[in-house]
Regions:
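Periplasmic-binding protein-like
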Residues: 87, 160-169, 252-278, 289, ...
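Short, glycine-/small- and polar/acidic-enriched structural segments
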Residues: 53-209, 217-218, 227, 234-240, ...
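Secondary-structure end/capping motifs
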Residues: 279-358
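N-terminal secretory signal peptides
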Residues: 1-26, 33-36, 40, 49, ...
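Pocket-lining segment of extracytoplasmic ligand-binding domains
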Residues: 142, 222-312
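Solvent-exposed, acidic/flexible segments
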Residues: 90, 118, 122, 192-196, ...
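Conserved C-terminal helix/tail region of periplasmic/extracytoplasmic solute-binding proteins
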Residues: 351-376
């Protein structure tokens, strides 16, 4: 059955249900449509019916309460649902997670979330989510897009914020712009880092070949500034908190961040959820996504309180320094839906230009495949 026919069958079945309850014809229409689609396709087709304001499940008498709750925007019912969320406790950009936990946002949405501080490779993290060792994770889009090409059963459900990637240049070497990096070396923490991937893109947009005209030298993250100080590199790029703290030494210029210029509205961090959780327990995935977005708004409104929540999990910097970092980010900016798919598409196109993503990848189809709307 084609998508258009599926949508027509679903629509007819629901309209009959709305007019007069269940009839034999409406039941057959709904059953036939549901049976013709894969799980994710069904969710997408059903969502198309909500455009006029109702949604599918709220109009069906006898639908499980947990499903009606999700469709109506109510809270999950019953005992709190236990979940495992993978994150990096040393990364300031994941502040929404501890805020959600410590300030009762997860509990408000009837979730009991356990943190898994993950230090392995991105592929290992995505595999952990896909196989159920964790239910979801918060991480960097520019680190995750390449591994997601491999087909992990993981879906991005929301952008979290932007602004945590910085490029710093040596004052002694007069590095104060992207153009001044032509023929220079940049210190990075790993060759697949989101910081490197972002500035590959930014340099290419300035007409600089980021592979042939710039050298990327790898060092342990905490030694990047030392490498610049010793002259082994003329610039460094990494993720807060370290770059922000190094700026205070006065030896480095902030050349750019991932909010500079045309990237002002881009996000860097995303929430991704296990595909089987979305298929089997969509209301849970919805509650988790809403919790993280609500916590992100709290971070934006009260960065000092967010810094206090985050500092309890370790990391670098005082509460005041962490709060200042959070103010420089865009924790109010967490796109979903078409806005987020557009950003994924743009990043994919840009990563293809710098040869991180395969040229054969269809950016539009890729964005559709790895994003799932759990909020509509």
């Amino acid at each position: 059955m084609k998508t258009r026919e599926i949508s027509r069958s679903l629509t007819n079945g629901v309209l009959e249900t709305q007019r007069g309850g269940f009839s034999r014809r409406s039941v057959l229409a709904l059953a036939g449509a549901v049976g013709a689609v894969a799980p994710f396709e069904f969710f997408g087709a059903a969502r198309a019916l909500t455009a006029s304001g109702g949604g599918l499940l709220p109009h069906i008498a006898g639908a499980p309460r947990i499903c009606r709750a999700a469709a109506n925007g109510e809270e999950l019912q019953g005992p709190r649902r236990q979940l495992k969320l993978a994150w990096n406790a040393n990364s300031v950009c994941t502040a929404a997670a501890p805020v959600a936990k410590e300030r009762g946002v997860f509990a408000k949405h009837n979730l009991d979330v356990e943190f898994v501080n993950f230090g392995g490779s991105t592929e290992q993290l995505l595999e952990a989510i896909a196989t159920g060792k964790a239910d979801a994770g918060i991480g960097m889009a520019l680190r995750w897009l390449k591994p997601l090409e491999q087909g992990f059963d993981v879906r991005i459900t929301a952008g979290v914020h932007g602004g945590c990637i910085r490029l710093l240049g040596s004052k002694a070497a007069n590095i104060d712009s992207l153009e001044s990096l032509r023929g220079k070396s940049i210190a990075i923490s790993d060759q697949a880092s989101p910081a490197k991937n972002f500035f590959l893109i930014a340099l290419a947009k300035k007409g600089i070949d980021p592979v042939k005209e710039v050298e990327w030298r790898q060092y342990p993250a905490n030694l990047l500034a030392l490498a610049v100080e010793k002259g082994e590199a003329q610039a460094l790029t990494d993720i807060d908190p370290l770059p922000y703290l190094w700026l205070k030494d006065g030896k480095l210029n902030e050349i750019a961040t991932n909010l500079s210029g045309e990237f002002a509205d881009r996000i860097c961090c995303v929430l991704a959820i296990r595909g089987s959780l979305i298929r089997d327990e969509l209301p849970v995935a919805t509650a988790l996504t809403r919790s993280v977005l609500e916590a992100g708004d709290r971070v934006a409104r009260d960065p000092a309180d967010a810094a206090a929540a985050l500092s309890g999990y370790g990391g670098r910097g005082s509460v005041e320094e962490i709060a200042a970092m959070l103010r420089s980010h865009t924790h109010h900016n967490h796109p979903v839906g078409d806005a987020l798919k557009k950003q994924i598409l743009l990043y994919t196109d840009e990563l293809k230009v710098v040869k991180v993503i395969k040229q054969s990848t269809d950016s539009t189809k890729f964005a559709e495949r790895i994003y799932f709307d759990v909020l509509s």
